[in-house]
Amino acid sequence: MNPVSYSELLRLTLPQIALTVAAFFVLACDGMLLRRSPIAVRARIAMLLSVAGSLVALALLPLTAPVQLLDGMLVLDARTGVVQVVLLLFTLAVTLLSGSVLAQQGREVSAFTTHIGEFFALLLFATVAALFLVSTQNLLLIFLAVEFLSLVLYILTAFNKHSRASAEAALKYFLFGGMSAGFLLFGISLLYGVSGSLDLQQIALAASQPDSLLLVAIVLVILGFGFKIAAAPFHLWAPDAYQGAPSLSAGFIASSSKVASFFVFAQVLFIGVASASGNAAWHLSAPGWMPILAAVAVLSMLLGNLAALAQTSLRRLLAYSAIGHAGYLLLGLIAHTPQSLAALLYYVFTYALAVLGAFGVLAILETNGIDSLSSLAGLSRRSPALSACLLVFLLSLAGIPPLVGFFAKFWLFAAALQAAPAFGLLWLVILAILMSVVALFYYLRVLRQVYVVPMAEDATPLSSPTLARITLLVMAALTLLLGCAPNLLMRWLR
């Protein structure tokens, strides 16, 4: 192991330290100074402290030349820096939305939680885990970060103590998560047995030699990460978790967690076991992780999009939609080129932006008693601003130009087509396009309720927190801006 520069290590981990200090400060302030204060006051102060911690972490991000410490335990480069910036921005958005919604509910917040400080501290702890997860190439630290992040997400899912659905969803999430952790740890132990190292670079050297044990290890790792990204058939936790968790907890799971999980999954496959990729092309099929991922992608696209057609709950619709999007994202891994990795990251960033915005709108709607498709009738007349935001987010998820979701799909599908000779992945791209058409149908079904179906005669205008409304409008504007200038983000990922 190379000598450790502790000053350099401290400098590179300052964002995580800032978030950790902010989390403990939020807990101490809420628990000791504000426990008897009105819930609205506690929510606003916890939100401000969390926002301050996130902004300090953003300012301390080490955007420097590529650096590697502790033999791959801490690896930072330009691409990792972009991922960390995105994760912190999503944390900021969730914090602003949560604080404003909780503050508006005031004493009625018991419908969600009275543990204000704990909620915001957990968001910050989850972000710390995600930042460590995307900045390491050591399998042991990857496993520890994944499981710490998962543990926080289990708690966030169960945070509504007054909801049996929340507790049931968290239990299912925990049980499936524990099983997936076992698969992932077993796979990591086999990779260590094959290579004698936990560093992805060293594993890559050992993986260049054919070994049946290596293929077993790869299958187990795919099983473990398949759960984290909610890909079929490892998706069974997702619909219940998305439906039972508090709206903004579900939004955080669907956005930040998915960004971090896909990035580290790509790192493991592209760096550690790239030589065992095989081939998923229709005319050049060869054993490896590519054909396995191709089967998972097909199942995810079919099951996710077809099941979403039958949903009447907005949350479950977004959950099955997430499964379908996981199938599209796997195309970026199957293509296995630098262009496909950039397209995958672009897609997962823009998907996370849109789905977090959709859950933000849903959080406000649920405070007004709207939680199903039928109750959306006439929403455009009751709240034009929220309806416009929902329109932008859903059409971006559907991939409609000129929104950013269209360019994300275009670049991802184009990278998949160019990856294999003779358009070997054309069959997967055609299926993805067909399933995108199916997805458009159920997104338009939601928008039909919002804009076409008349509202009930006794319906009243919706109340929505000003800060939450501004946050959602900024996110919708960003979705439009990135669609009008798609290279604005892509140039940082190439």
From Swiss-Prot:
Keyword Nucleotide-binding assigned: no
Record's catalysed reaction(s): a quinone + NADH + 5 H(+)(in) = a quinol + NAD(+) + 4 H(+)(out)
Location in the cell: Cell inner membrane
Pfam families: Proton_antipo_M
InterPro entries: NADH-Q_OxRdtase_suN/2, ND/Mrp_TM
A GO MF term: NADH:ubiquinone reductase (non-electrogenic) activity
Keyword vocabulary terms for this entry: Cell inner membrane, Cell membrane, Membrane, NAD, Quinone, Translocase, Transmembrane, Transmembrane helix, Transport, Ubiquinone
Gene Ontology biological process terms, A to Z: ATP synthesis coupled electron transport
EC number: 7.1.1.-
Membrane topology type: Multi-pass membrane protein
GO CC term (a single one): plasma membrane
Transmembrane spans: 14-34, 45-65, 82-102, 116-136, 139-159, 174-194, 214-234, 262-282, 289-309, 317-337, 344-364, 388-408, 422-442, 470-490
Role noted for this protein: NDH-1 shuttles electrons from NADH, via FMN and iron-sulfur (Fe-S) centers, to quinones in the respiratory chain. The immediate electron acceptor for the enzyme in this species is believed to be ubiquinone. Couples the redox reaction to proton translocation (for every two electrons transferred, four hydrogen ions are translocated across the cytoplasmic membrane), and thus conserves the redox energy in a proton gradient.
Family: Belongs to the complex I subunit 2 family.
Oligomer and partners: NDH-1 is composed of 14 different subunits. Subunits NuoA, H, J, K, L, M, N constitute the membrane sector of the complex.
Name of the protein described by the UniProt record: NADH-quinone oxidoreductase subunit N 2
Species of the source: Acidobacterium capsulatum (strain ATCC 51196 / DSM 11244 / BCRC 80197 / JCM 7670 / NBRC 15755 / NCIMB 13165 / 161)
